[in-house]
Regions:
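N-terminal secretory signal peptides that target proteins for export/translocation
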Residues: 1-6
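Bacterial N-terminal signal peptides
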Residues: 9-22
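Signal peptide processing junction and immediate N-terminal pro/mature segment
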Residues: 20-31
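PEST-like low-complexity, intrinsically disordered acidic/proline/serine-rich tracts
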Residues: 30-58, 62-75, 80-190, 194, ...
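A short glycine-rich beta-turn/N-cap micro-motif
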Residues: 103-106, 203-204, 225-230, 249-264
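Aromatic-rich beta-strand edge motifs centered on tyrosine
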Residues: 123-125, 197-199, 219-224, 241-253, ...
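A mid-sequence, solvent-exposed acidic-amphipathic segment
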Residues: 197-237
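Active-site and channel-lining beta-strand-loop segments
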Residues: 221, 245-255, 332-344
Length: 584
């Protein structure tokens, strides 16, 4: 499962360059943002907590984008070695760990042999719930698999997750009440929140609480390269010690992103080895990992206190915003503009770019552990997979468990599999919100710009009837944008779409759909903002309807806003494992 997702970004970059050369003024797009401030750089001899936490995440390759946010939201690793089964070591033939840090979730699948006997297990934790599965995703689809609740295993599994090579610095930042070290105060000293720093034998030692495990305290000792060589967690009468070494980028050679992970890992409980692993491969680029909790597990588990929310940076917490310039402030006291028939008038130009991308301001500088041939421009392309908005948020579509690996595989081969890379439209709802709207009493027209969802796609348009007509059951034509009809529910415009083809994705990350997809979009204008809500149903591939994170479109007063260049031609070239497209 490996593919250089960044390779396709070269084509996307061409599109951006061409778009920048299109005959649009800066004011037409709301103006460009000011240059980013110089990045925080600790002094070489800095020994305060801010410097140590920053160096920890920086040296591990966890900082992404020109703003250097910590953006490792999910990962997988595979390994070999031994695990303890019934108190005795068992030689692994399979070990696969899938982690979602945003939801405090981890699924570990292993198979091992001892004395001619095969053992296997699927161990899962998600927030305050723990269980074992007989098949991956047991009970998420009714009648498929068996989930066995194990409430007594929650604490040990959360400790393993948050003491892991990437989990430990995240937990330390969580304890410091700041998800980005470079945002800590300069005078923080050796303490911030519940996270403390000491120096022992010339090495930084960071102490922090384990999220979700009251009373559990971790002590991480970092080496000269600011990577954890040991993390010791004390919780009641149990001491769990994790030893790490041989840090490297273990991703496939086709998708090196220079995020480091430990190659050697040993776990001991009260001095006894329980797991000894050698990493064979990682996938650190925000891979699709979901850990939904079966209803039977929730019913069997008593949760006495709310589980702590894992802090996320503002980029992740804010699901909408203008890419270019500052959005207009909502005129809350201004009367609602209405048409002659009394409907809210949505005619106008709208800042509809959604997301915060590294190429807003420029390229990320090379980090201290990156290869000698690193360039900021190269970082821009590798960071793309971390910053594409549909890939880093916790609100991902929940696919049927048997399709989870397919989503990952499509993601790995995005540049060949993503339909937009072969010149096809983004489709609905991936196209995002419209840049310009024309409204009449009978229909509404949307004009879309290009570059949505991290740089892909072309300008497109939709003309949608809003006269309460129903879908034509005789129209069997499938379309990229579907067959859409609209009606008003009070002051909300509701668009109902069916009749899609299966040649678009819901977003970057392999989020495919079937031709049975049904999409409902809602547009509600208040002042000079439009709330854009989307619900996607696709029982062929999804476990449940996907309710997309609401977005806001903000009015742009410039008369040139919403102008888009003509949809260009597109040519596709096959380059071994890379599909390259040139727009002109």
């Amino acid at each position: 499962m490996a593919f250089p997702r960044w390779a396709g970004l070269l084509a996307a970059s061409v599109a951006l360059v061409l778009a920048a050369n299109a005959p649009l003024t800066a004011s037409a797009q709301g103006g460009f943002p000011p240059p980013a401030p110089p990045p925080y750089t600790p002094a070489a001899d800095a020994k305060d907590l801010k410097a140590v936490l920053f160096n920890w995440t920086w040296h591990m390759g966890m900082l992404r984008g020109i703003d250097e946010h910590e953006l490792i939201v999910s990962l997988e690793y595979q390994g070999k070695g031994t695990v303890q089964v019934d108190g005795q070591p068992c030689a692994l033939t399979k070990y696969r760990a899938s982690i979602n840090y945003q939801t405090s979730g981890e699924r570990i699948q292993y198979t091992c042999n001892r004395a001619g006997k095969t053992y296997s297990a699927i161990e899962v934790v998600s927030g305050p719930y723990a269980w074992n599965e007989d098949v991956v995703g047991a009970e998420i689809v009714k009648g498929k698999g068996k989930a066995t609740p194990l409430p007594g295993a929650v604490e040990a599994r959360l400790i393993r997750l948050w003491a892991s090579p990437q989990g430990a610095p995240k937990a330390a930042l969580q304890g410091a009440k700041q998800p980005d070290a470079n945002k800590l105060a300069d005078d923080v000293g050796n303490s911030a929140g519940d996270t403390k720093l000491a120096w022992e034998g010339g090495k930084p030692v960071v102490t922090f609480p384990i999220p979700g495990v009251p009373g559990a305290t971790a002590t991480a000792t970092l080496n000269a390269k600011y990577m954890a060589e040991s993390v010791v967690v004390r919780h009641g009468s149990t001491t769990t010690e994790f030893s790490y070494g041989d840090y490297n980028d273990w991703n496939s050679s086709l998708n090196k992103v220079e995020v480091l992970y430990a190659g050697k890992m040993t776990e001991k409980q009260n001095g006894k080895v329980v797991r000894e692993l050698t990493t064979t491969e990682t996938e650190t680029g925000s891979v699709y990992v979901v850990v939904p909790v079966p209803a039977s597990v929730k019913a069997a588990t008593k949760v006495s206190a709310p589980f702590p929310a894992i802090a996320t940076i503002p980029v992740l917490a804010n699901p909408f915003g203008a890419l270019f310039g500052q959005p207009a402030q909502p005129a809350k006291d201004e009367p609602m503009p209405r048409t002659a028939d009394g409907k809210p008038d949505m005619t106008g130009n709208w800042n509809s770019f959604v997301g915060f991308f590294n190429w807003r301001y420029g390229n990320r500088r090379c980090g201290p552990t990156q290869s000698s041939d690193c360039t900021p421009a190269w970082n821009q392309t590798t960071d793309f997979e971390f910053e594409a908005p549909s890939r880093f948020g916790p609100n991902r579509p929940l696919y049927k468990p048997e399709l989870w690996d397919k989503v990952q595989q499509l993601d790995m081969w995005t540049n060949k599999e993503d339909p937009v890379m072969t010149c096809q439209p983004l489709g609905v709802p991936r196209q995002g919100g419209p840049s310009r709207i024309f409204q009449t009493a009978r229909d509404i027209t949307f004009i879309y710009g290009g570059g949505f969802d991290g740089g892909g796609g072309y300008p497109e348009y939709r003309i949608i009837p809003t006269d309460n007509r129903q879908h034509d059951p005789k129209d069997l034509t499938t379309r990229y944008m579907g067959q859409t009809v609209g009606h008003w529910e009070g002051d909300t415009l509701v668009l109902d779409s069916v009749g899609f083809n299966d040649q678009t994705w819901l977003g970057r990350g392999g989020f495919f759909h079937s031709d049975q997809m049904h999409v409902v979009e809602k547009f509600t204008r208040k002042g000079n903002e439009i709330l854009y809500e989307v619900t996607v149903e696709d029982p062929e591939v999804l476990v449940e309807p996907w309710v997309m994170t609401p977005r806001k479109l903000t009015a742009n007063p410039s008369p040139d806003a919403g102008l888009v260049a003509e949809r260009g031609n597109c040519e596709v070239y096959e380059l071994t494992n890379i599909t390259s497209q040139i727009r002109h």
